[in-house]
Amino acid sequence: MSIKNLYKNLNDEMGSISKRRKNNNISFNKSTFDSHAMDALNTSFENYEDISLEGFESYINESASRTVIERNSLVPLKDYDAVHSLRNAFGKPPRDNEPRIGTHPEFKHLELDNRTDTGYVVTMFMDIIGSTKLGLSYSPSDVFLFKNNIITGAIETINAFDGHVHRIMGDAVMAFFRSRQNEQHDTLENSVIDAINCAAYFIEVMNEIVKPQIKEVADENIGIRIGIDLGETNYVLWGNYGIPGVNEVTATSFFVDIASKLQHKAPKNSIMLGQNLVEKLGLTVNDYLTYKLKDGQPDRYIIDFTSKNQSRLRYKQYLLNQSKYFSILPHGLKPSRIKVVISYSNDELGLVNRKDYFNCSSVIPKGKWVKFHATFCEEYGEHYESLKFKFRVVNNGLDASKKDNYDNHETEIIKKAYEKENGVFTAIHKEQTSYKGLQHMYISVISNDTVIEREIPCSIFIK
């Protein structure tokens, strides 16, 4: 399923809004709406007499006078299918509760008194950039609807990945990812993965839906920026700020503040990750991370501070390689005739504590056995006497880097025609989890030394 189909309502509404600009009676200079700096606007206006203050006021008033019935259409349609499909793709059970804003549900008790509590949190900040000139291209109601559709899509994606919307600040959203279950089982990484996957999907929405729609009718340089970081339990304090009636339960942490700074440093339609989060997952610059460039040089640090006593605080920032990472997520995988079911267990036979796994959905502890159950179905008219399944391991991270060639290896399994059932060949291969980080199993199908189905990735986070 494509992103456009996944977020069908958002795609349709963005298309409707963007095309309404064509019918506006006011004629603005097209160069006004390109990606140049805003100071070019005044120059553009000086060259055109048809842009009058009276005309612009009339344009504003026309939108403001819309009927109540018309204004009801400003409420975005929810993409329930997107939430459901995303949760299915990552093996998450249905989420019954409607999303709420404000205090995180696990800290509601702090609203009643002046106590504080500790608890880890993954904080995500997202904001819309480059939208200032939309008000010159569209009516205020369409600008509102345009921004609100983006905000609504972000909220639904956050909800799909078990996040909690804490604040909406104009055209920005602040969300928390955490759960008591992950805290109790020491699987904070799962909340980190949820936040990254959430952000990656919504960047893809901007790239595949919003950006193309708006570019059809105007040269708007619109996008979003996302910053994410992890604060572990002993470094995050939850408490009730304010006075009764004017109060908010929120998280206080260096890492919450850093997430906000990362968002401001992120390039358009990009995700910036903090050092603590990256180290927790075991990611490295060699796999799915890079550095933002500043004056042609890597901009490695979001904080680089030397105190009066000459002690130095340095905190790294990383840019997620969006296209590379999204390509291994369920909706980024290329169509393939190879189908794979992944599971893991405590023993090689798969008898003890067996669990299903979905690409990039959660962490698996070291020492577990992962089973890859691969199938390949012959098409009409095909008949293979034998097929070879190739299982190719590609490891990443500091743990694996200490081994020769990262301990990368291949295993080939040959299946004869008499072993297939109803035209379906099956091969099963098992590997033990050994190295922290994001590791991959690439599976392909070969006949007579010719690849008949290219590699598909099975990507697993190992704790």
UniProtKB/Swiss-Prot annotation:
Stored InterPro entries: A/G_cyclase, AGS_C, Nucleotide_cyclase
Obligatory cofactor(s): Mn(2+)
Keywords: Antiviral defense, Cytoplasm, Lyase, Manganese, Metal-binding, Nucleotide-binding
Keyword presence, Cytoplasm: yes
Main location: cytoplasm
E.C. number: 4.6.1.6
GO cellular component: cytoplasm
Name of a matching Pfam family: AGS_C
Chain positions recorded as a ribonucleoside 5'-triphosphate binding sites: F125
Positions that bind Mn(2+) 2: D127, I128, D171
UniProt xrefs under SUPFAM superfamilies: Nucleotide cyclase (SSF55073)
Residues covered by region (AGS-C domain): 334-454
Any single biological process term in GO: intracellular signal transduction
Guanylate cyclase domain boundaries: 122-231
Cysteine disulfide links: none
Keyword Transmembrane helix on entry: no
Protein location: Cytoplasm
Subunit annotation: Homodimer.
Record text about domains: Has an N-terminal nucleotide cyclase domain and a C-terminal nucleotide sensor domain (AGS-C).
Family: Belongs to the adenylyl cyclase class-4/guanylyl cyclase family. Pyrimidine cyclase subfamily.
Function, as annotated: Pycsar (pyrimidine cyclase system for antiphage resistance) provides immunity against bacteriophage. The pyrimidine cyclase (PycC) synthesizes cyclic nucleotides in response to infection; these serve as specific second messenger signals. The signal activates the adjacent effector, leading to bacterial cell death and abortive phage infection. A clade E Pycsar system. The pyrimidine cyclase gene of a two-gene Pycsar system, generates cyclic CMP (cCMP) from CTP in response to bacteriophage infection. Has little to no activity on ATP, GTP or UTP. Expression of this and adjacent effector Ec303145PycTM (AC P0DV27) confers resistance to bacteriophage P1, T5, lambda-vir and phi27.
Descriptive protein name: Cytidylate cyclase
Gene that encodes the chain: pycC
